[in-house]
């Protein structure tokens, strides 16, 4: 019975969201598609899509409620929790009444001399238990109410992406296959090596390959558009709904007034996810750069590279903390060691290579490639599996900025700022829906996704 009641309450949960253009959503889902299936966590604040690889790499895509044209999440468990908390608070009163009745019966059966003393002790003990139970029930009820309401399920991410592009016009797919999805793939449109017609056979980590694999067409047709919200393609509207545990995820896609497609995707029990959380208070280093810079750095790494070290260093990282006060250490005499920089060191079968990106000391320096640079005491060189970090190449090609953060334990966080999530209405185009057109103009937000990667064990690492 309790299990059935929980399932019934979960089945009453309602999630409904609408979007006037699915381009941003599709590109965001493609960025975290490192696995076939993904875990979706829905709450009143929005959706979170999580994929995990080898218990070492996690990808998170955050779709906040304000990114949708309309978003509604209702949880029927609120009523169930409310009734449970009321019952919990009423239990101590029932216990106190029973205890008082028991004390009165004991008083009538005991002698007059000892009854006053025993009843006084019984009443004091009863009041103490009542206060303790009331306090514990109140804490439990407050803890239940403090927990955010959410529901999690698992879906086939590749199916979801394919459904969003059912009418076309969403934009080219960002494949993760053995051709264009290679970590070393670098589009070179307009280069002298490209053959006439725009068709390119670009240099990859594994030699020369077709830039877009089995997909035939010119680079202009198949290449990624840096402005996915151009007015050349028609927008695909979407309505997403989910009715709770055991129910499918329903997508209603519409491009024209007379064309409507309804897709029902199966949902599964969410898989176990590794507890990987980046705590901001444990951050020891942070760098914000343009995604193109990070992409070019990863592209230049040799194909046989297995291990990559990342070092964020500055003269301030040599300082020590004394409580809230920071004491600067004497500046080193070596100019190279005193420079603030982001350093990559890759080890491959053919040797090792190093790349250094100096940090600009002044915001007015136009030659600086790093927008923000933070290196606190405790920042040290950390090694990572490059085959996992190379999974970020697809999102590097479609993002604008990249924030690289590192904590004391070496856990690294890549946060990618994606292009504008909503589609701007074309100039002079008639708006069939005034509300949707107004929403497209207002409150445009930058979406982002995050990759978390654990470091290698340096105690057993052979460099």
Curated annotation (Swiss-Prot):
EC supergroup of this enzyme: hydrolase
Keyword presence, Phosphoprotein: no
EC number: 3.1.11.2
Domain of life of the source: Eukaryota
Pfam family for this entry, one: Rad1
Location of region: Disordered: 81-128, 172-203
Keywords linked to the UniProt accession: DNA damage, DNA repair, Exonuclease, Hydrolase, Nuclease, Nucleus
GO biological process, one term: DNA damage checkpoint signaling
Reaction equation(s) it catalyzes: Exonucleolytic cleavage in the 3'- to 5'-direction to yield nucleoside 5'-phosphates
Disruption phenotype: Cells are very sensitive to UV light.
Basic residues bias spans: 90-100
GO molecular function annotations of the record: double-stranded DNA 3'-5' DNA exonuclease activity
The keyword Nuclease is assigned to this record: yes
Record-level GO cellular component terms: checkpoint clamp complex
Main location: nucleus
Localization (cell): Nucleus
Function text: Plays a central role in regulating the genetic system of this fungus. Has a 3'-->5' exonuclease activity.
Entry similarity comment: Belongs to the rad1 family.
Protein name per Swiss-Prot or TrEMBL: DNA repair exonuclease REC1
The species this protein was found in: Mycosarcoma maydis
UniProt lineage: Eukaryota, Fungi, Dikarya, Basidiomycota, Ustilaginomycotina
Gene encoding the protein: REC1
């Amino acid at each position: 019975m309790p299990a059935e009641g929980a399932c019934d309450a979960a089945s009453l949960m309602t999630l409904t969201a609408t979007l006037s253009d699915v381009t941003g959503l599709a590109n965001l889902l493609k960025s975290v598609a490192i696995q076939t299936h993904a875990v979706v966590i829905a709450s009143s604040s929005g959706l979170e899509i999580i994929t995990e690889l080898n218990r070492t790499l996690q990808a998170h895509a955050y779709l906040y409620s304000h990114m949708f044209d309309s978003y509604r999440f209702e949880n029927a468990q609120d009523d169930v929790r409310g009734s449970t908390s009321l019952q919990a608070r009423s239990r101590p009163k029932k216990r106190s009444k029973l205890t008082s009745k028991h004390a009165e019966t004991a008083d009538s059966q005991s002698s007059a001399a000892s009854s006053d003393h025993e009843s006084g002790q019984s009443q004091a003990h009863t009041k103490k238990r009542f206060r303790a139970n009331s306090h514990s029930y109140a804490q439990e009820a407050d803890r239940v109410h403090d927990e955010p309401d959410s529901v999690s399920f698992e879906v086939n991410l590749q199916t979801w992406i394919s459904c969003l592009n059912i009418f076309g016009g969403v934009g080219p797919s960002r494949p993760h296959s053995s051709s264009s999805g290679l970590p070393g793939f670098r589009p070179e449109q307009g280069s002298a090596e490209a053959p006439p017609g725009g068709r390119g056979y670009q240099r990859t980590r594994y030699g020369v390959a077709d830039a877009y694999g089995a997909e035939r067409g010119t680079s202009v047709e198949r290449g990624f558009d840096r402005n996915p919200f151009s007015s050349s393609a028609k927008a695909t509207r979407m309505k997403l709904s989910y009715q709770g545990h055991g129910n499918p995820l329903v997508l209603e896609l519409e491009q024209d007034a007379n064309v409507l497609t309804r897709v029902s995707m199966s949902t599964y029990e969410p898989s176990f996810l590794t507890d990987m959380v980046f705590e901001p208070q444990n951050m020891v280093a942070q760098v914000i750069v343009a995604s193109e810079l990070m992409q070019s750095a990863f592209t230049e790494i040799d194909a046989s590279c297995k291990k990559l070290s990342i070092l964020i260093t500055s003269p301030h990282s040599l300082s020590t903390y004394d409580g809230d006060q920071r004491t600067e250490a004497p500046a080193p005499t070596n100019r190279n060691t005193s420079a603030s920089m982001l350093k990559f060191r890759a080890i491959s079968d053919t040797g090792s290579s190093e790349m250094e990106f100096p940090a600009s000391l002044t915001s007015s320096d136009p030659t600086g490639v790093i927008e923000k640079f933070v290196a606190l005491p405790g920042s040290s060189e950390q090694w990572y599996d490059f085959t996992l970090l190379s999974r970020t190449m697809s999102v590097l090609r479609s993002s604008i900025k990249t924030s690289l953060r590192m904590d004391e334990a070496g856990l690294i966080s890549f946060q990618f700022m994606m292009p504008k999530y909503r589609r701007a209405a074309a100039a002079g185009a008639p708006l069939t829906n005034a509300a949707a057109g107004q929403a497209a103009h207002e409150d445009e937000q930058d979406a982002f996704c995050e990759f978390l990667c654990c470091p290698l064990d340096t105690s057993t690492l052979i460099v």
